[in-house]
Amino acid sequence: MPSEWVFLIIWLIPMASGGTTAPSLSASPIVFARNLFRALNDEVPPVNMMVSPAAARAMTLVFMGAGGKSADELRSKLILGVSNKSEVAKQHAESWSDECSCAKRGVAMRLVTRLYVNEEEKIRTDFNSMALEFFNAEADSLNYLNPEDSVKKVNKWLEKQTFYTVRNLFTPEVFNPDASVILVNSLFFRAKWDKIFPLQLTKVEDFWINPRQRMELPMMRQIGQFRYGESKKLKSQILQLPFEMSNMTMMFILPTAIDGLAKLEERLGQLDMNEVAARSLMKEVDVTIPKFRIESSVDLKVPLQKMGINSVFEAGQANLSGVFEKKSPQRISEARHKVFLNVTEFGCEVAPESDVQPEVLKKNHDRKVFKADRPFVFAIRDKKNVYFVGHFIKP
């Protein structure tokens, strides 16, 4: 089976009726990832969950059209730092230009944004020009009085941008007379493990959901040189699996105790992923991780408000005057986040290889053992960004 990582975030911006100093922009994705994951963990029930901090990119575009308190909150909580919006846009475009051009290095990413506008509303031309130049965003008009045609148009575009992994996401009910702008941000990620897992070593084993409950699922295994660490502070093991021809890795953080995930995530709320990754060194490791798939759908409005982004969601408080030609009250009423993750022996959306050689497992008493047979945290990252972060709790 092919494997794919696909991130999709959709912001619905309907019409409502009736300068902080921060860390550098280059550091903001790492810190934002920590803050978002921490806020989300406070709200969601204990189920498989995954989120992409690339959500910050969609909200940065909202920041470009925001004013007053709305802009101040977004600047502060997105950790944009620079008060000049043109500099924010320029630096943002430069950082993502490097990331999205890495296909030749073994990892492929596609990050695209599109604005869908009720044809009764008009977007400022300067905002639209900026969105296209710096955010790879395009604006398109829709007739919300004809929701069937509108939903077909949007769903068709989403399918194409996600290589047909996301289908029929929207329903006609989304396009109603109260809606004004739909901002869609899509991140597609595809990669192959630097060292794939031998198929013949994948076996069905127990996965402990808690000390009293277990389920069977396929567990992949291999032995190799990987970045590995043990943290007394986190009471966890740390493992980084690299992707082929890339500086990106999938990091696993495995609590020592079967029921240690909650305490681990509480401690992780005080650290960023770079700090965690720094605790690992190259070691020979016997690795066993589950073959798993996550489909996660999250309402981001609650965690974003918990982080302090409130004004843009509140009627009579939101200021999006930089988006529309006419001055009228607007607010973001809903934020949906949908993501898919499929982890296999080969990586991400990579077909099985016919020339994979069997692996002989030799004994080595100095070898570290990393067996993820209980709930764990994972992150797909490099030193500059956290692209996905989540936890796996049960099959």
Show the residue positions of the predicted features.
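Secretory/exported precursors with cleavable N-terminal leaders
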Residues: 2-395
